[in-house]
Amino acid sequence: MRNSSSSTPPSIKAQHRAAKRRAIRRRRIDLNCGCSIYIHIDCRNNGFTHRGTYHCASSREWRLYLGDNKSPLFQDNQRRGSPLHQHQDIPLTNQVQPQPEESIGSPQGISQLPSMDDIDDSFWENLFK
């Protein structure tokens, strides 16, 4: 039942519908491994790690889409400022920390638990009394 009072605020359903239809602004980055990453436009100049390699999502590399079929035209804007690292004579080490390989066995913190079938019935009877 609708409220006939003039003090009720207008419905925001129309605004919600428009917000749902609005496209998410994101940028596509094609990596050397063949993967494509989509980064939200507000997350520019942030980095990310993919398959053990750190990538910087700066505005140096960007993709421009043309027309309705979105054909890619790759651009690489060359930086015209000072170099990123001022001291070129100091060797820079790789800051990427390798990820440990996953093991098939049980985790280190949990020892192997006995099978529930190996526990005798008297234990369960005493437990639930």
From Swiss-Prot:
GO terms for cellular component: host cell cytoplasm; host cell nucleus; viral capsid. One of its GO terms (molecular function) is zinc ion binding. A zinc finger (unnamed) spans 33-50. GO terms for biological process: symbiont-mediated suppression of host innate immune response. A motif (Nuclear localization signal) lies at residues 13-28. It comes from the Viruses. Keywords: Activator, DNA-binding, Host cytoplasm, Host nucleus, Host-virus interaction, Inhibition of host innate immune response by virus, Metal-binding, Phosphoprotein, Suppressor of RNA silencing, Viral immunoevasion, Zinc, Zinc-finger. It is found in: Host nucleus; Host cytoplasm. The keyword Protein transport does not apply. Changing residue 40 to A: Enhances transactivation. Residues 115-129 are annotated as: Transactivation. Residues 73-118 are annotated as: Disordered. The keyword Zinc-finger applies. Residues 91-114 have a biased composition (Polar residues). Changing residue 43 to A: 72% loss of transactivation. Phosphorylated. Disulfide bonds: none annotated. Belongs to the geminiviridae transcriptional activator protein family. Strong activator of the late viral genes promoters. Enhances the expression of the capsid protein and nuclear shuttle protein. Acts as a suppressor of RNA-mediated gene silencing, also known as post-transcriptional gene silencing (PTGS), a mechanism of plant viral defense that limits the accumulation of viral RNAs. Suppresses the host RNA silencing by inhibiting adenosine kinase (ADK), a kinase involved in a general methylation pathway. Monomer. Homodimer. Homooligomer. Self-interaction correlates with nuclear localization and efficient activation of transcription. Monomers suppress local silencing by interacting with and inactivating host adenosine kinase (ADK) in the cytoplasm. Interacts with and inhibits host SNF1 kinase. Binds to ssDNA. The zinc finger and the transactivation region are involved in PTGS suppression. This is Transcriptional activator protein. It comes from Tomato golden mosaic virus (strain Yellow vein) (TGMV).
